Design a protein with these regions (language model features):
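Phosphate/pyrophosphate-binding active-site segments
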Residues: 2-8, 316-365, 379, 383-452, ...
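N-terminal cofactor/phosphate-binding cores enriched in small/glycine residues
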Residues: 5-94
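Active-site diphosphate/adenylate-binding microenvironment
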Residues: 13-17, 21-24, 34-35, 39-40, ...
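A short, small-residue-rich loop immediately preceding and capping a beta-strand
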Residues: 26-29, 50-52, 70-109, 297-305, ...
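Glycine-rich, anion-gripping cofactor-binding loops and their flanking helix/strand elements
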Residues: 87, 220-223, 235-325, 333, ...
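Thiamine diphosphate
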Residues: 105, 112-126, 432, 459-616
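Glycine-rich, acidic loop regions that bind phosphate or pyrophosphate groups
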Residues: 106-158, 263-362, 390, 394-407, ...
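Glycine/aspartate-rich loop-and-adjacent alpha/beta segment that forms the canonical ThDP
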Residues: 166-169, 173-214, 581-617
């Protein structure tokens, strides 16, 4: 515990930091600047905080997002006054949309130096609009004990709001008067003699912040689900802190209902395939056969989290409008299709635990939940089981599950055979090869645009326990490299799959190389432009397509890597790539560039993605 009694600002900032560390903070990302000096000094000198200096604010924010996403705990992000904080904005949007806890601390000038052209001053109050979970401006630092208590409790509340009821960013605007440096001030001597640190911080522990009570559970119609003979589970993109428990819970639900499970590639489910015998990975390709898609129409869909990326799947659901139940504990609206939907504000793990408990107690799974009751012993809302005699369960139709299983088997075999025999450097094969070649448990960050879609199309199920990571909150390409480095920092050796434009958009992330602890291999699909635009109608209009949409940059990545002292290799064959991935290094950053033909790859997709279904199951 360290309270810096040199002056008013050092006392204030060190109490702020000490409060955060007692709540559980371990990492702070600090951008250089003058006005944030008290915060930087406090974080940098605290023995329990890993303080990481990063030059570029946008890169810093995405790196912090990556660290927070991996750990599940808030990361502090500090900058000086002026436009510095504006560069955090893209990562704050992503943090809100993808539910990542961040604590944004923007230093500011005091009120008397605003709106008077005092320099490096903008309006930072509510700088990030409605994206933070909570935001406030702290008082100007003071030595009065009541104000120090106010600071402590405000920081506790900020920590809580970054985590509950739904994780996301919190913004504290922090004004400081001069002197900003830790210049000694005799005025703090009296406070130092009276300050009882252990008493002041006695109640500040991780246990002092409790989750908010869960939102009241809706009626969970388990009996209705079990009675349905054309039910389906769709598991969308997910980055759970405990991927195995997440996959086990979904497996329990799927097998207890005998529902096929459509599993997004940006989910750990495909990498714990042994847990889920009803897993369907080729749904996008299956649904391209419109006659077969009609035969597979469900009457009921249980959606776990957000929908998968697939446009084919979304269009199919939108066309047939089945009743949908969305299982997710967050308070967001997760129905982008505006269908016949009921949100169930509960985690899939809670439902999986309920199923396990009933099996353990030899009760019939399927008894279902009914209206909520409050357990008066702990005031936690609990589901109540419907009595066995009240159940009405009709026999399930095994043919619906078999139709999906047969289609999956046929198309999976066709995709795997096609990919295995493909000699050319087609960018989609990179995603398939990663599913076959990465060491078990490898953290894999997947960039937006075509990489996420290639993973959904081609990623083959297995038991590798690979954990996919991504920025699909706002779906932008900004911060790709920096986020991946944040995921990989002090983690198992990691891999990133990215296109050339996404990497170029964040090359300042390479400046992290001298502070980065761990290893990241970057699989760079270089098709010299935006490959995803080749899949859109605008690609037929030339000009302006190539110059203004594909935007080729003609970059020599070997020279770029040399500038940043990053290892580089050009990939000439799939066998070479497999060898380089079989055992990942433990330190540093390396780029493995796969040169591809953007237009040839787009033509291949247009020709082949709809041709894998040869016969109906």
């Amino acid at each position: 515990m360290l309270i810096d009694f040199r002056n008013t600002n050092t006392v204030w900032a060190s109490i702020l930091v000490e409060t955060l560390t007692r709540l559980g903070l371990t990492t702070a990302v600090l951008c250089p600047g003058s006005r944030s000096t008290p915060l930087t000094v406090a974080f940098a000198q605290h023995s329990q905080v890993e303080a990481i200096p990063i030059l570029d604010e946008r890169s810093a924010a995405f790196f912090a997002l990556g660290v927070a996403r991996k750990s599940g705990l808030p990361v502090a992000l500090v900058c000086t006054s002026g436009t510095a904080g504006a560069n955090f904005y893209p990562a704050i949007i992503e943090a809100r949309e993808s539910r990542v806890p961040l604590l944004i601390l923007t230093a500011d000038r005091p009120p008397e130096l605003r709106d008077c052209h005092s320099g490096q001053t903008i309006d930072q109050v509510k700088l990030y609009g409605n994206y933070p979970n909570w935001q406030t401006e702290l008082a100007v630092p003071s030595l009065e004990i009541g104000m120090l208590r106010y600071l402590r409790q405000t920081v506790i509340h900020a920590w809580e709001r970054s985590r509950f009821p739904t994780p996301g960013p919190v913004h504290l605007n922090c004004p400081f008067r001069d002197p900003l440096a830790p210049i000694p001030d005799p005025a703090v001597t009296e406070l130092q003699s009276q300050f009882q640190a252990e008493d002041f911080f006695a109640a500040v522990t991780p246990a002092s912040v409790h989750p908010l009570s869960p939102a009241p559970l809706h009626r969970i119609p388990y009996s209705d689900w079990q009675a349905c003979d054309r039910g389906l589970i769709i598991a969308g993109l997910a980055q759970p802190q405990n991927p195995k428990a997440y996959c086990q819970a979904i497996a329990q639900l799927s097998q207890s209902l005998n529902f096929p499970l459509l599993a997004e590639g940006l989910s750990p489910l495909r990498n714990y395939a042994h847990l889920n015998p009803y897993l369907i990975s080729t749904y996008d390709l299956i649904l391209r056969n419109h006659q077969l898609a009609q035969h597979l129409t469900p009457t009921l869909v249980i959606q776990i989290g957000e929908l998968p990326t697939s446009k084919e799947l979304r269009a199919w659901l939108n066309t047939y409008q089945p009743q949908r139940w969305i299982i997710d504990p967050c308070h967001h609206n997760l129905d982008a299709l505006h269908g016949k939907t009921t949100h169930l504000r509960i985690s899939i793990e809670a439902i999986g635990q309920w199923i396990t408990t009933n099996k353990t107690q030899n009760q019939t799974v399927g008894a279902g939940f009914t209206d909520n009751v409050v357990d008066k012993t702990d005031n936690v809302t609990q589901p109540t089981l419907i009595k066995e005699q009240e159940r009405t369960v009709s026999p399930q139709n095994p043919h619906y599950l078999k139709k999906w299983y047969d289609a999956e088997t046929q198309i999976r075999e066709a995709v795997d055979k096609t990919m295995a025999e493909m000699p050319q450097l087609f960018e989609g094969k990179a995603a398939w090869l990663l599913s076959q070649s990465l060491p078990p448990g490898t953290p894999l960050f997947i960039a937006n645009s075509m990489p996420v879609r290639d993973v959904e199309f081609f990623w083959s199920p297995g038991n590798t326990e690979i954990q996919p990571w991504f920025n699909r909150g706002a779906n932008g390409i900004d911060g790709t490299l920096s986020t991946a480095l944040g995921i990989a920092h002090r983690n198992q050796s990691a891999v990133m799959l990215t296109g050339d434009l996404a990497l170029l958009h964040d090359t300042n992330g390479f400046l992290l190389n001298n502070k980065f602890a761990g290893h990241l291999t970057i699989i760079l699909i270089n098709n010299n432009g935006g490959g995803i635009f080749e899949m859109l109608p605008i690609s037929d209009f030339e000009p302006p397509f190539e110059e203004f949409f594909a935007t080729p940059q003609h970059i020599d990545f070997a020279q770029l890597c040399l500038t940043y002292r990053v290892e580089y290799q050009r990939i000439e064959s799939w066998q070479q790539l497999q060898q380089l991935l079989s055992s990942l290094p433990s330190k540093g950053i390396r780029v493995l560039e796969i040169p591809t033909n953007r237009k040839a790859d787009a033509t291949w997709r247009q020709t082949h993605l709809s041709s894998f279904v040869v016969r109906e199951p």
